[in-house]
Swiss-Prot record:
It comes from Sorangium cellulosum (strain So ce56). The lineage of its organism: Bacteria, Pseudomonadati, Myxococcota, Polyangia, Polyangiales. The keyword NAD does not apply. Its EC number is 4.2.3.175. This is 10-epi-cubebol synthase. The keyword Metal-binding applies. GO terms for molecular function: metal ion binding; terpene synthase activity. Belongs to the terpene synthase family. A motif (NXXXSXXXE motif) lies at residues 220-228. Binds 3 Mg(2+) ions per subunit. It catalyses: (2E,6E)-farnesyl diphosphate + H2O = 10-epi-cubebol + diphosphate.
Length: 315
């Protein structure tokens, strides 16, 4: 069942300050009260989140990478809380209440005070990320985070109703619940190459972004399958295929891998035909697309080794 996924992109080299990043991020996570415990397993997970960020943005200015890395840690812990809250029987309105304060941080000028520590931690990240970044980029990032929040509520509703979404609905929502669009936004932030809306919304560029999202999202579903099936979570491409096509796990896994690989081929074809704008934008767009390639490969390699997915009882 573990056939290799297609990943024709070169292996990445981590940021030269990766070790310092890991130490700083762990200290920030501890200071903000995000750690559920101080077990070696939990600490290893935090270090693995830092390793992912260091490989995904190897050329970033360190302070910007710090903000990205802290967001990664925030996101992984927050995602687990939302998932575990609804899996343990809480109604979607409980998840919505948790998310409400986070939503307020995105829109408000000051830190929200409810549901600490997540709102306070995000407010700290948000203040740092906002410095010196153009308004159109901040609005885009906010929209993508809000779409993720809406996706968390949708998942909670599905769990309450014991509902497995159709493949079509799932794939559409997966583009938001995976948070990949935020990670693509961080490529701009890390490289100081902010692309105007008319560039990222160009149909061909938008399809490059969507295809890259699908590659990373479906790879995540495959690599996290053990974690999610142990949690009885249905929001996974393999599980959706099992349910919709009435096939066994092995066949669904192979189907999901094939869907992933087809998106890789589609992405490779798309990037041969990028539109042109101006000399500066064209250079930045090329760097942006290269950043997506780097991210996909870094995530592929990280997913194989991270304790988040690869412990015997990965949860």
């Amino acid at each position: 069942m573990h056939r290799a996924l297609l990943c024709p992109f070169p292996a990445t080299t981590p940021h030269p300050q990766a070790a310092q990043l890991a130490n700083d991020c762990l200290e920030w996570t501890r200071k903000c009260g995000l750690l559920p415990d101080e077990s070696p397993r939990t600490l290893d997970k935090v270090r693995s989140y830092s390793a992912l960020a260091a490989h995904c943005y190897p050329d970033a200015h360190f302070e910007r990478l710090r903000a990205i890395c802290d967001y990664y840690s925030w996101l992984f812990f927050f995602d687990d809380v939302c998932e575990n809250t609804s899996l343990n029987g809480a109604e979607p309105k409980v998840v919505s209440s948790l998310l409400f304060d986070v939503y307020g941080v995105l829109r408000g000028p000051t830190a929200a005070v409810g549901h600490a520590p997540f709102a306070q931690a995000l407010a700290d990240i948000w203040r740092r990320i906002g410095d010196g970044c153009p308004g159109f980029w901040r609005r885009r990032l906010i929209r993508h985070v809000e779409n993720y929040i809406d996706g968390c509520v949708w998942e909670a509703q599905n769990r309450q109703l014991d509902r497995v979404p159709s493949r079509a609905v799932f794939e559409g929502m997966r583009m938001h619940t995976s948070t990949m669009y935020e990670f693509w936004d961080f490529i701009e932030y890390a490289g100081d190459l902010f692309l105007p809306d008319e560039v990222v919304e160009h149909p061909l560029v938008a399809e490059v972004r969507r295809a890259g999202n699908a590659i990373a999202s479906f790879a995540n579903d495959i690599y996290s399958l053990r974690k999610e099936t142990s949690n009885r979570d249905v929001h996974n491409l393999v599980v959706v295929l099992m349910h919709e096509e009435r096939i066994e796990l092995e066949a669904a896994y192979a189907r999901a891998a094939g869907i992933h690989d087809a998106q890789v081929e589609h992405f490779l074809d798309l990037v041969k035909h990028l539109p042109t704008f101006s000399a500066t934008i064209d250079r930045n767009l090329a760097r942006y697309v290269e950043g997506i390639r780097i991210w996909i490969r870094a995530n592929h390699d990280w997913s194989i080794v991270t304790p988040r997915y690869n412990e015997p009882d990965a949860r």
